[in-house]
Structure formats: structure tokens, C-alpha cells
Amino acid sequence: MMPSRTNLSAGIPSSKVKYSKLASTDDGYIDLQFKKSPPKIPYKAIALAVVLFMIGTFLIIIGALLLAGYISKGGTDRAIPVLIIGILVFLPGFYHLRIAYYASKGYRGYSYDDIPDFDD
């Protein structure tokens, strides 16, 4: 007589374990593996985009007022650098806010994964 195999994890002899055959229509997949997890929203990156957008807007307005002469300190030699810095700060903020807005509304092709996250 051969010794019976035992299930080492439970200590139960294998002859006493009941098995049931899987249904023939089972393709080996479970529904849970196809379920999409809710998107992880990068709050820090969106907050940084808001700050960049606001600072850039402020600098563009100040630069335009300097250039138009409504603010008389400095003239054109100060207006152009302020405008350039304002545009350089405004553009990334606007870009990432636009992606965040479209991702929140569920537009096709936009997701929160497109926004760089600053998780440590």
C-alpha cells in the first residue's frame, strides 16, 4: 500500500480533500482583473499648476501694463522680461490645468496619468 499524500499546509490527507471540476464555460479569467481601479488624482501637481497659472497670469498683466505705460516705472526695458517670464510660467500651468480639467470631465485621450506626480 502506498502512503497517501498529505496537504502540508493544512495537514489533511489528500484523499479527504474534495475537488470540484470547473465549469466548461470558464475561460480562466475573473471579472475583477478587468475592473478599472478609480484614477489616482495628483493633487500636489494640480496645486502647483494652479500656482504657476496664477503667477504667470499676474506677471503677464503687470508686463502688459508696463508696456502700455499705465505703470510708469521702468518702461520697455522692464516690461519685456516680465512678459517673457510671465509667459514661461503661465504655459506649463495652463497646460496641466487643461489636462486635469479634461481628465475630470472624462474626455477620451485625457487621464490623470498624463500629469507628472510628485509622490515621494
From Swiss-Prot:
Keyword Transmembrane helix annotated: yes
Residues that span the membrane, as ranges: 46-66, 79-99
Domain of life, source organism: Eukaryota
Family: Belongs to the TMEM134/TMEM230 family.
GO BP, sorted A to Z: axonal transport; synaptic vesicle transport
UniProt keywords, alphabetically: Cytoplasmic vesicle, Endosome, Golgi apparatus, Membrane, Synapse, Transmembrane, Transmembrane helix
UniProt-listed InterPro entries: TMEM230, TMEM_230/134
Keyword Zinc-finger assigned: no
Pfam families from the UniProt entry: TMEM_230_134
The name this protein goes by in its record: Transmembrane protein 230
Compartment(s) where it occurs, according to its Swiss-Prot or TrEMBL record: Membrane; Golgi apparatus, trans-Golgi network; Cytoplasmic vesicle, Secretory vesicle, Synaptic vesicle; Early endosome
One annotated Gene Ontology cellular component of this protein: trans-Golgi network
Record function comment: Involved in trafficking and recycling of synaptic vesicles.
Bilayer topology annotation: Multi-pass membrane protein
